[in-house]
From Swiss-Prot:
The active site is at E80, C112, H235. It catalyses: acetoacetyl-CoA + acetyl-CoA + H2O = (3S)-3-hydroxy-3-methylglutaryl-CoA + CoA + H(+). GO terms for biological process: farnesyl diphosphate biosynthetic process, mevalonate pathway; isopentenyl diphosphate biosynthetic process, mevalonate pathway. Its EC number is 2.3.3.10. Interacts with acetoacetyl-CoA thiolase that catalyzes the precedent step in the pathway and with a DUF35 protein. The acetoacetyl-CoA thiolase/HMG-CoA synthase complex channels the intermediate via a fused CoA-binding site, which allows for efficient coupling of the endergonic thiolase reaction with the exergonic HMGCS reaction. It comes from Sulfurisphaera tokodaii (strain DSM 16993 / JCM 10545 / NBRC 100140 / 7) (Sulfolobus tokodaii). Catalyzes the condensation of acetyl-CoA with acetoacetyl-CoA to form 3-hydroxy-3-methylglutaryl-CoA (HMG-CoA). Functions in the mevalonate (MVA) pathway leading to isopentenyl diphosphate (IPP), a key precursor for the biosynthesis of isoprenoid compounds that are building blocks of archaeal membrane lipids. This is Hydroxymethylglutaryl-CoA synthase.
Length: 348
């Protein structure tokens, strides 16, 4: 049995923070912002977190899938910013959406790639006929130390996919590959409030090497060429890297631009590349093929070949599009952002 994406959904908080304002506050040159290709980043309201956003995205995915939540038999949640250090978010999603208690669930961790791994796992479970439908969610309120360059891009958003049989799918998962190494490019030890990053490792040895390796493996094993794909979506830590990796792979930039989200909302970690995929699915036509390659620090990358079916056009209209969320925004000041996200602790 083949598997595919039956339904997809997204959620992006309404609040936006101007990236240039952050840069000026901490003394960064305007050229730094320009070089990153970022304009604004999405940030949560005081009552939003990775769990509430996950529920929003999953509800949208259910609307598109048009299935009863009780039919879902596996729920996987990928995040770097879980509300609880020890308590799964996937169980909260199960009860809040009316999913059966007779369901496999787990929270996954692999930096920005955990949800992508979940997508591969659910695809395999469906293909092995162990489940009919599974739900995977990538949701993050991305963490960054105030004043660190990461604060220019770290953002909040969520994306969800319901995986099921190919004959019911909006898009078929044709093939997938993975590439993984031990790479110290980004980490957060237990008890640390914010992650650290080894800047010498974040570019060529980590992001570019892993994505290129996963994509080249997909092309080789699947028998594809670059020209077989209509859209390419890469992990988006900023607006510059996905364009650079496209150039290295010989991908025309016009095949990348529709999947870009980071210039408008920043990098929402687990919802980065998969949110770009959702943005493409919102507009894709039957017969078009998409290559999506998420990346997670530590480090690893997956590459998927996804073929759009004739069921997609009906489902595109059933829930808000990623573009709708991008355009529905309210710009706030850094001080409001710092207050609503508890950036600074008050000790009495």
């Amino acid at each position: 049995m083949s598997s595919g994406i039956v339904g997809w959904g997204a959620y992006v908080p309404r609040y936006r923070l101007n990236v240039l304002e952050i840069a000026k506050l901490w003394g960064y040159d305007e050229g730094v912002v320009k070089s990153l290709g970022l304009m604004e980043k999405a940030v949560p309201s005081h009552d939003e977190d990775s769990t509430t956003m996950a529920w929003e995205a999953a509800r949208n995915a259910l609307m598109r899938a048009k299935i009863d939540p009780s039919e879902i038999k596996a729920v996987l949640f990928g995040s770097e910013s879980k509300v609880y250090a020890v308590k799964p978010t996937s169980t909260i999603i199960i009860d809040s959406l009316g999913i059966s208690h007779e369901t496999l669930s787990a929270d996954l961790e692999f930096a920005c790639r955990a949800a992508s791994v979940g997508l591969r796992l659910l695809s395999g479970m469906v293909e092995a006929n162990r489940i009919k439908y599974g739900l995977v969610i990538g949701s993050d309120v991305a963490q960054s130390n105030p004043g660190d360059v990461l604060e220019l891009s770290s953002a909040a958003a969520s994306v969800a996919y319901i995986v099921g049989p190919a004959d019911e799918s909006s898009a078929i998962i044709e093939y997938a590959t993975s590439y993984t190494t031990d790479m110290p490019d980004f980490w957060r030890r237990d008890g640390m409030p914010y992650p650290l990053h080894g800047e010498a490792f974040t570019g060529e040895p980590a992001y570019f090497a892993h994505i290129i390796s996963a994509v080249q493996l997909l092309l080789k094993e699947g028998g594809y060429s670059i020209s077989d794909f209509d859209y390419f979506v890469f992990h988006q830590p900023n607006g510059k890297f996905p364009l650079q990796v496209a150039k290295k792979l010989g991908v025309p930039l016009e095949k990348v631009k529709e999947g870009l989200v980071s210039p408008y909302i920043g990098n929402p970690y687990n919802a980065s590349a998969l949110l770009g995929l959702a943005k493409v699915l919102d507009i894709a036509k039957p017969g078009q093929r998409i290559l999506v390659a998420p990346f997670g620090s530590g480090a690893g990358s997956d590459a998927f070949s996804i073929l759009v079916t004739d069921k997609i056009e009906e489902r595109q209209k059933l829930a808000p599009r990623v573009e709708d969320y991008i355009n529905n925004k309210k710009v706030i000041s850094y001080s409001v952002y710092a207050k609503t996200t508890n950036k600074y602790k008050v000790y009495e």
